[in-house]
Amino acid sequence: MTLLGTALRPAATRVMLLGAGELGKEVAIECQRLGIEVIAVDRYPDAPAMHVAHRSHVINMLDGEALRHVITEEKPHYIVPEIEAIATDTLRELEGEGLNVVPCARATQLTMNREGIRRLAAEELGLPTSTYRFADSEASFHDAVAAVGFPCIVKPVMSSSGKGQSFIRSAEQLAQAWEYAQQGGRAGAGRVIVEGVVKFDFEITLLTVSAVDGVHFCAPVGHRQQDGDYRESWQPQQMSELALKRAQEIARHVVLALGGHGLFGVELFVCGDEVIFSEVSPRPHDTGMVTLISQDLSEFALHVRAFLGMPVGAIRQYGPAASAVILPQLTSQNVTFDNVHAAVGAGVQVRLFGKPEIDGTRRLGVALATGENVEEAVIRAKKAVSRVTVKG
């Protein structure tokens, strides 16, 4: 039984978002639809989810004392992390004191960095992964590359959106790759993972929901990556029945091992009928923004329904759909979007995130489209993006 109070009243049900970006914004909107009181927290003011929250706070979420203070002040019933860069030791302490961390503090801690989740998947669960080594100094980094071999990929153990990642083809790139990885970590310089390159036909995100009525799967989401970040995603990604079954088995093992209720973005490589585990996020996934147009329940609605203890039931997928990101490069604290009217139309939507500023390249929005097939949907989404002019 789920009892929900009314926002801004004594019996209000309160949800605190740790991270208030575009994904958190959609989670906040789903909470608002249920009359839930929303508190958004991030490291900078006027973050997207703060626009649709009842209150907001600006703190360094890696500062355990500051994190504990804001949680103690607001007394949320549900603490919902949106990003990895959080003082997860503090979350475990707070969970031990009776607070509800979504999906659970252990999941946020294990997935905060690539080492925790890789060791769980490969060494504890025995799931197929790429070859890998970890390194915490430049010397051990060279040893790790020698063990894995060329070509390989180096990533900070904690980073997002491709920051700090390099594709290494030769020894001449090692010094630059190490330095770039040290600059790109979400918690500053430190440990890296060196991964062997996996041969694959395509990558998918299998959005997997762990709820009171069991584990549920969305149709697989295909996506194209560039510079470590996604550019387009589409649903459904066509794959063999055997590969889909194996992907679902891997995802089920991972989410049940992590524990708790919520939506998980399980990233997988697919080569023919073979499936290899890549990463998992215990929260909605950026490639899953396509579900805003492709499903009756978006990944955000599913996440909220699951962590509130409600059954998910069946997930209806409407048909071929795609997303394409609006990713301008400029510097401005007063961004405007021109020609949006030419981008939207029947079966085409535009979502602008409301980020307060840009300094370089930043994802500021997404176009969503349906089509007769995924190829057409991707073309329509990309065409919509091309029609939007970002100014500053």
Swiss-Prot record:
Q: Which residues bind N(1)-(5-phospho-beta-D-ribosyl)glycinamide?
A: 22-23, 82, 286, 355, 362-363
The answer to whether keyword ATP-binding applies is: yes
Domain of life of the organism encoding this protein: Bacteria
Q: Name one Pfam family in it.
A: PurT_C
Residues recorded as binding ATP, renumbered to this chain, are 114, 155, 160-165, 195-198, 203
Q: Does the keyword ATP-binding apply?
A: yes
Q: Which residues cross the membrane?
A: none
Q: So what EC number does this one have? A: 6.3.1.21
Instruction: Provide GO CC annotations from the record.
Output: cytosol
Please give the family membership noted in the entry. Answer: Belongs to the PurK/PurT family.
Protein task = Involved in the de novo purine biosynthesis. Catalyzes the transfer of formate to 5-phospho-ribosyl-glycinamide (GAR), producing 5-phospho-ribosyl-N-formylglycinamide (FGAR). Formate is provided by PurU via hydrolysis of 10-formyl-tetrahydrofolate.
Name-wise, this protein is: Formate-dependent phosphoribosylglycinamide formyltransferase
Q: Which organism is it from?
A: Salmonella typhimurium (strain LT2 / SGSC1412 / ATCC 700720)
